From Swiss-Prot:
Membrane topology, as annotated: Single-pass membrane protein
Keywords: Membrane, Transmembrane, Transmembrane helix
Organism listed in the record: Saccharomyces cerevisiae (strain ATCC 204508 / S288c)
GO cellular component, one term: membrane
Compartments in which it is found: Membrane
Taxonomy of the source species: Eukaryota, Fungi, Dikarya, Ascomycota, Saccharomycotina
Other observations noted: Almost completely overlaps REV1.
Transmembrane segments: 22-42
Protein name according to UniProt: Putative uncharacterized protein YOR345C
């Protein structure tokens, strides 16, 4: 039983706070964004580690340093540009998903009058 003042319109239906929509929002926006951030963090740290490791390898014949594997591949300007473009696109996607999760298309759920 809902307590209402005379002339007050009926409260919005309970489906306005549908839990399946909330789960959909969390699963489709938050989880991939966090997973993508974690993947990029691991990927960047692996690249940094592999570059350091490969630059520390010493050729025993003439004691000259071997160039890092990624640095050799990244001498191509196109590859470096594509990598940077990919990382920029991913960060824009993450920011866009966060902004979508912060916006609500429905009015916020309010307690039913008399049960606050």
């Amino acid at each position: 039983m809902t307590l209402r003042a005379i002339g007050e319109s009926s409260p919005p239906p309970r489906s306005a706070c549908n839990s399946s929509q909330l789960i959909f929002l969390v699963v489709n926006l938050k989880v991939p964004a966090v997973g993508l951030e974690l993947f990029l963090l691991v990927w960047e740290s692996w690249l940094t580690y592999s570059i350091k490791e490969s630059s520390l390898n010493v050729d025993r014949k003439d004691l000259a340093f071997k160039p890092p594997v990624f640095a050799v591949k990244c001498e191509s300007l196109t590859l470096c540009w594509l990598r940077q473009l990919f990382l920029s696109g991913v960060s824009l996607f993450i920011e866009y998903s966060k902004s979508l999760s912060n916006k609500s298309t429905r009015p916020p759920c309010s307690p039913i009058a008399g049960y606050a």
